[in-house]
Amino acid sequence: MVSVPLRWYNIAADLPEPLPPLRDPEGLREESRIALLSRILPSRLIEDEYILARWVDIPGEVRKALARIGRPTPLIRAEGLEKVLGVKGRVRIYYKSEAVLPTGSHKINTAIAQAYYAKLDGAKEIVTETGAGQWGLAASTAAALMGLKATVFMTASSFKSKIQRRLLMEAQGARVISSPSKLTDTGREALEEYGSTHPGSLGLAIAEAVEYTLESGDRRYLPGSVLEAVLMHQTVIGLEALDQLPEEPDVVVACVGGGSNFGGFTYPMIGARLRGEGFEKTRFIAAESTAAPKLTRGEYRYDGLDSSLILPLAKMYTLGHRYTPPPSHAAGLRYHGVSPSLSILRRLGLVEAEAIPQEEALASILLMARSEGVVPAPESSHAVALAARIARKLPDGSVVAFNLSGHGLLDLDALQKALEIRGASMW
């Protein structure tokens, strides 16, 4: 019987080359951005970020909380999807469902650990950013579980369109602020430059959250993705999947925003491959949005993690820290960069990537709903779309596995759009 993992997996121990260190922006005359991390992040999170051990023990209180919220999550044979795609009897498809968690997505896995770390530091409030609201809801829930206040900067486009998830955050006691806002210098500058119609971006929301965190020593900033510690916390997904999969997949797919979902699902398998312990022929493919195609069209270089260069620079695939993605129903994928470890794997050819157009992703919401009875989040539907696209082309006997990172029951705007375009045959 599968149980909650005792340890996280840290891919840094198995990468073919060392992770490039974070850097300060050139010509910086102010406080070191790297030193700044010690003022805003939970101290234990910083330890997790730089640890080199392959296996890291999950604190008992965190593991207990993960069990309370419903881990381990199920791995499901998608027989209905196989039938609709016309591959039943030829290709087997499995998906790991993070949608069954109470907050509706994988984000709660690291939120619990980070809120616990903030509590250990004696913090009274956690601060973060969110796009579609999945991370904001997870952080708000984790804060409530740990007895902490929460402030969430939500990208303006999602603040208006993802009302239900915003209400759920507020139900957990969080204060939710539309970004860009007038609460910070960063937000005010963006509003002055672009006006009140600015859709916001994750990079901008991060900058606001960090600036707000710095105003009080009782606050800690919780990052939702990109940092290696966050990806490590998410490996509970892939570690469970290793115990659940009845056979080794030929193709493994997950959507990618900053990298935590993709890394969480695939890194335990990629790590096994790097150590020569299996998955030698498996293809690992990231499904990104055409609205933020960093892995397919970005540059591999040092760039800011946020739009205002408040945080350090990381070496990663990036579209540029000032890039403002167009509005998208998959707000959680609207980030300009991706984690350094995933960037290395992409550059070395160990990970492939494909950008999925919004219409194809939205149509895949209905594909999954009508074949499996599950409404995926707009972000997760990118993985569904790519898995479906690939499954049709695979030879007999092939196996596909993908991560369903969250449900779309609160993404009614995306569902409405999907229903409007359902006449377009995408499968």
UniProtKB/Swiss-Prot annotation:
Q: What is an example of a Pfam family matching this protein?
A: PALP
For this UniProt record, the keywords arranged alphabetically read as follows: Amino-acid biosynthesis, Aromatic amino acid biosynthesis, Lyase, Pyridoxal phosphate, Tryptophan biosynthesis
As recorded in UniProt, coiled-coil segments are none
Give the sites modified to N6-(pyridoxal phosphate)lysine: K107
- Which enzyme class? lyase
| Cofactors (names) | pyridoxal 5'-phosphate
Superkingdom of origin: Archaea
The pathway is:
Amino-acid biosynthesis; L-tryptophan biosynthesis; L-tryptophan from chorismate: step 5/5
One GO CC annotation: cytoplasm
Q: Which GO terms describe its molecular function?
A: L-serine hydro-lyase (adding indole, L-tryptophan-forming) activity; pyridoxal phosphate binding; tryptophan synthase activity
Query: Which reaction is catalysed here?
Result: (1S,2R)-1-C-(indol-3-yl)glycerol 3-phosphate + L-serine = D-glyceraldehyde 3-phosphate + L-tryptophan + H2O
EC number(s) given by UniProt: 4.2.1.20
Q: Which Gene3D superfamilies match?
A: 3.40.50.1100
What quaternary structure, including any partners, is listed in this protein's UniProt entry? Answer: Tetramer of two alpha and two beta chains.
Which family is it part of?
Belongs to the TrpB family.
Described purpose of this protein according to its UniProt entry? The beta subunit is responsible for the synthesis of L-tryptophan from indole and L-serine.
What's the protein name? Tryptophan synthase beta chain 1
What species is this protein from?
A: Aeropyrum pernix (strain ATCC 700893 / DSM 11879 / JCM 9820 / NBRC 100138 / K1)
Taxonomic classification: Archaea, Thermoproteota, Thermoprotei, Desulfurococcales, Desulfurococcaceae
